[in-house]
Amino acid sequence: MSVIQIILIALLVIAVIAGLVFLWRKAPKLEVTIKKTKFVAYAAVQMILVFLAAYGMGITLLFTGAVEGHFGNLAQAYKKYGFSHCFVSSVLDRGIKKSGDYSEEYMDSLKNDLDNVDVEASEKTPNIIFVQLESFFDPTHVKGITLSENPLPNYQKLISECSSGYLSVPCFGAGTCNTEFEVQTGINIDDFGPGEYPYRTIMKSKVCESMAYDLKKLGYSTHAIHNNDGTFYDRNLVFSHLGYETFTSIEYMDGFEETPMGWAKDYILTGEITKALDSTAGTDYVFTISVQGHGDYPSTPMEGYTPEIKVTNFPVAEQQTSFEYYVNQIHEMDKFIGELIQSLSERDEETVLVLYGDHLPTFDFTDEMLTNGDKFQTQYVIWSNFDMDRQEKNIQAYQLSAYVMQRLGISEGYIMKYHQSKQKLPEDEYLKNLKILEYDILYGKKEIYGGETPYEATNLKMGIDDIEITDVYNYNNTVFIEGSSFNDYSCVLINGKEYTTEKVSDRLLRVNGINVKKDDVVVVAQKGDDKVELSRTTFTCLLYTSPSPRDTERS
């Protein structure tokens, strides 16, 4: 937007407001009865004018630099800039804007450059595992605090021995899915509208080049894992557009523990990652999202909870208790990291593990409180069970996957190739070309692919294990359902009606106070706390009564 356009918008906003004030003060005041339809029309016009004024002012403030164009924390932005600006920006200013340089010729030139990118290929095709650690950072980076013991011995050991560095992330305190999006796709969130979550906009309907799609070309099986609701940030919809073949959410896990604040503990992820690796004969790519460190954190001591690690001298006194609770949660996350490393070390398959924090936790940090001086930085580390040279490199979240793949001799996909070959450009040129490439892939004519995207949405399978029904029978005015892979999220529907379901074991469910008849249709569906059905298994009944539960002999 040019300076002249900004001035014209500002003048228009001022003129509209001045006109409304003038009419209100100078127009004749008549005591008449106004028809309801006219009143509604007048009110609608006034609301539209006010909305346009708010939008115009918001755009003016945005482009003049009076307010930020990027919201690292949407909730904090609402507090800082107010509802009108944030709402208008979030609703209307979406997507990646088309550059004046975007053209078929421009993209042909870029495509030619990237097609000639030469990365030293490797004969290794290791399993590749990414673990995104919720709200995870090293608390010793907070200046002045005292800890009764080291909360992250495993992670700090990895940082000192393996390739690692600071990771600049697009969010602070919230917005996990935006760091997640950058890491998987290599796309810069700053190129979208302020406060936008692509998972909830473009990614619900469009496929996008990603690390999963790139590795699928090389024969990898692709898995996503998250120990929280599958519908959170619409991941159950988005992951098929990012190239994943399976997605194991909390609704497909059994036997996990919860934190005092109700989040699943991360130790469950070791077994789920192992299950994904064991599910195929070939190499696997596993993208894992943890949740244990998630806020909110208790502001007062919790009854029955005794922290293992004591924290003193936290710089925000009123958040002292909350931070101590947080430190103890990430201490448990560090234990999970140690267990995962041990498990992967014992496997015969070559494996690379990438660990990183998605953002800092929700505390009133300023840059000055942190030893690294940036609240939009976490850390990453690259571990492997085979020899890799140790490097220290600070990078952006949208550069992480390309960097890891380059270390492994992998160069697939145009965004990955761009990051691997163009980072030495002047920053302005590097980011400008990246934005044009992003626009072409998501919103443009797909010139980089010759006019049509090569990617198709996958038929996403929820969970690794098949949920099966092997038998349904009546016993003592109770319906029993036998099968496999049942858990606390399994619910029974009979002829379309949902019934209260009790899990007896992972192989047996029961519904009290009812009997089934021949040809009744029994469904076991997986539903989370939001009651959205993620998958279902169907069984048509044969009529019989069992003398006892779990008796598979028909009498």
Residue ranges and their predicted role:
Residues 1-126, 147-166, 201-205, 209, ...:
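N-terminal secretory/membrane-targeting segments
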Residues 35-37, 544, 552:
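Generic cytosolic/nucleocytoplasmic N-terminal low-complexity/intrinsically disordered segments
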Residues 115-126, 133, 138-502, 508, ...:
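Solvent-exposed soluble domains appended to multi-pass membrane proteins
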